């Protein structure tokens, strides 16, 4: 794959820029060259890596080390895939111990994590406090027809939509993933409350901070594993100029309450080969101020072909029929 210079199709002009990317999934054949193609546009560029780098700890280390040697600062938050413990992983550690191991690994490489002091971006588009967060999810993004986690999971199982997290993402020492989420919410909120409210923030979380992006999911039941309603007002409460996330594999730009939300995922080869973006890296700061027509009808950074529209319509019809049974 050709070298991907940061800023292609954007007005960075070789000046310091804050970029973001997520869901590199470098353990998948075809995605490692994507990571290898990423380069800054200036020596002072920063890069946000919003989770799902890989699943094996050695592959996570390889990817973050590669990026840290190229960018002036790398800021990482975990996705659900980093927290999986698979039989192929050289480190058989689980739950919070696994997260702590990854934080220590990043610390050794000079990569910023949710456990470090929040870095302050003072270049173009700043000042802005970059807030990397690890919040997980609590099953409150319920699918239609559900009033509780149990009902939501029952609907999801009936429709054969069950996240692999249920088998590979251990919450230990917590009893449940939602208990871990509650703890992370409390500790993160306490740190956010200490920020200077006059300084804008860039909120970074693997999962979307609001429910609305999940409306674009082909399988709406998957929303159960996509976030928490407890963060619905954080982008306004904590003075965000941008909220960066991934997870959904629906890369696009949207606005909620006049705050820009950037879903910056690469996704799996079978996905991005159909709708390869103009640039792998997404500009966060300064505000890219997209030109009219740059974003497609859904906020995506790629051209929608007639074939794509036809395939999407066919898929949604099959989905409607499945849900009506």
Regions found by a protein language model. Give the residues of each.
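Short, solvent-exposed loop/turn segments at secondary-structure junctions
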Residues: 25-26, 54, 81-83, 120-121, ...
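Metal-dependent catalytic neighborhoods of phosphoester/phosphodiester hydrolases
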Residues: 30-34, 53-69, 81-109, 122-125, ...
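Active-site neighborhood of phospho(di)ester-bond hydrolases with catalytic His/Asp-centered motifs
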Residues: 20-22, 47-52, 75-80, 113-117, ...
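N-terminal active-site segment of His-dependent metallophosphoesterases
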Residues: 1-76, 82-87, 174
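Binuclear metal-dependent phosphoesterase catalytic core
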Residues: 2, 109, 215, 221-239, ...
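Beta-strand-turn-beta hairpins that frame and shape the catalytic cleft
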Residues: 9-19, 118-132, 200, 255-260
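Short amphipathic alpha-helices and their capping/turn segments at secondary-structure boundaries
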Residues: 62-68, 113-125, 147-149, 186-199
């Amino acid at each position: 794959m050709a070298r991907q210079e940061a800023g292609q199709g954007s007005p960075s002009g070789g000046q310091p820029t804050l970029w973001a990317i997520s869901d590199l999934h470098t353990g998948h054949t075809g995605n490692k060259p994507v990571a290898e193609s990423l380069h800054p546009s200036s020596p002072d560029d920063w890069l946000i890596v919003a989770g799902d780098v890989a699943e094996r700890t050695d592959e996570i280390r390889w990817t973050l080390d590669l990026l840290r040697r190229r960018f002036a600062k790398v800021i990482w938050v975990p996705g659900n895939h980093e927290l999986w413990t698979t039989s192929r992983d050289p480190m058989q550690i689980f739950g919070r111990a696994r997260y702590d191991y990854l934080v220590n690994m990043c610390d050794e490489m000079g990569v910023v994590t949710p456990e470090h002091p929040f870095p302050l971006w003072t270049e173009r588009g700043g000042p802005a406090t970059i807030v990397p967060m690890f919040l997980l999810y609590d099953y409150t993004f319920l699918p239609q027809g559900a009033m509780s986690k149990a009902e939501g999971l029952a609907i999801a199982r009936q429709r054969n939509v069950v996240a692999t997290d249920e088998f590979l993402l251990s919450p230990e020492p917590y009893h449940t993933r939602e208990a871990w989420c509650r703890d992370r919410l409390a500790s993160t909120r306490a740190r956010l409350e200490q920020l200077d409210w006059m300084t804008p923030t860039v909120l970074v979380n693997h999962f979307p901070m609001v429910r609305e992006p999940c409306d674009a999911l082909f399988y709406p039941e998957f929303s159960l594993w996509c976030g928490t309603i407890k963060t619905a007002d954080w982008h306004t409460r904590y003075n965000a100029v941008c909220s960066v996330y991934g997870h959904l594999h629906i890369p696009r730009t949207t606005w909620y309450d006049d705050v820009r939300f950037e879903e910056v995922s690469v996704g799996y080869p079978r996905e991005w080969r159909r709708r390869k973006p103009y640039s792998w890296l997404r500009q966060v700061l300064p505000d890219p101020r997209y030109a009219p027509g740059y974003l497609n009808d859904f906020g995506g950074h790629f051209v929608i072909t007639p074939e794509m529209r036809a395939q999407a319509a066919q898929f949604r019809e099959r989905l409607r029929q499945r849900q009506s049974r």
